[in-house]
Structure formats: C-alpha cells, structure tokens
Amino acid sequence: LVRCLGDVNDKRIKAIAKVESAGSGWFESGLPKILYERHKFWKHVRKAVNRVVAWFANPTAGDYTMDANRNGINDSWEKLALAIGKEPLAALMSVSIGKFQVMGEYYAQCGYNHPIEMLHACSRSEMAQYELLVSYILNVAKILPAYNMLSTNPERCRAFARAYNGAGYEKN
C-alpha cells in the first residue's frame, strides 16, 4: 500500500498513525476510533433550527471527552448518536474516523457514496483505514510531496502536519 504513495517502507505511515490515534484505529470496546467534532456538525447542519448550542453542536471546536459520564462508551460515539437524531448526514460528516482520523466530510473524494459507508468500511478492516489514508493524501489534501518529506526531523514534518490537520495543527 505504501507503494501507492511512492514509498519503500511503512515508517511514514506508522508515524502518522502514532500522532493521529496513538497507533490504533480501535477503542478498547472494539469500535473504530472516531472523534466527534461539534464545530463541523455546526457547519454542516442544513437548517439553522437544528443548531443547538450544546456539547454536540457548537461553532467552536472543543469538549473532546473520552467517557465523561463513566458509562464505558466513548463520548464521541454518544455525541454522534445524538447528532444523528438531529441531522444524520451532517452528523456522519462531522466525525474523524479510524487510525488516521480522516473526516467523514471527505467521503466522496475518498471513493465512498456516503459517510456511513466510509465509517462501516473502517469498522470492518484496518486495511480499509490504511486505504482511506492513501486516498485522503492523494485525492483530498493532495499532499504527496509533503508526505514524502516526512522524516525524523520535526522541521521537515511541519508542511505535512499543516496540510493534514490545518493551520491550527500546532495546538494539537
């Protein structure tokens, strides 16, 4: 798969996985890792009436909790469920998915017909998560040159980090 990126080994992809998801695409529960991003939901809802200023819909990023109510379910999955009740497509476009935390909003550019299809693929296979990363690098962010510059030198990684995570990447 790394050959699709013109690479000869998997060191770069492993480094991305380590930064994006601590190296795993799965929670201990067996569910794929997601991060519900309330500011993305706010952006994607089609009707302003469905915008509820709360922990699951807000114009400001934040409130990334793991299990605030201690029920054993990752909060991102709970927030996603509540958002789906308001606006399903917007909700599914508002999560970053899997080992490489690719946003659901990029489902079409990554070759899926719907964001639920992208989430389902990533829930079934780690290989699908790797394929999603390759598709994102080549088709969405178009950051292959920055990917090829990744190295153990942090300065050489900045261009990729900025392109992959946006201008505010240093906050994370």
Annotate the PLM regions.
Residues 2-172:
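Catalytic glycan-binding domains that act on GlcNAc-containing polysaccharides
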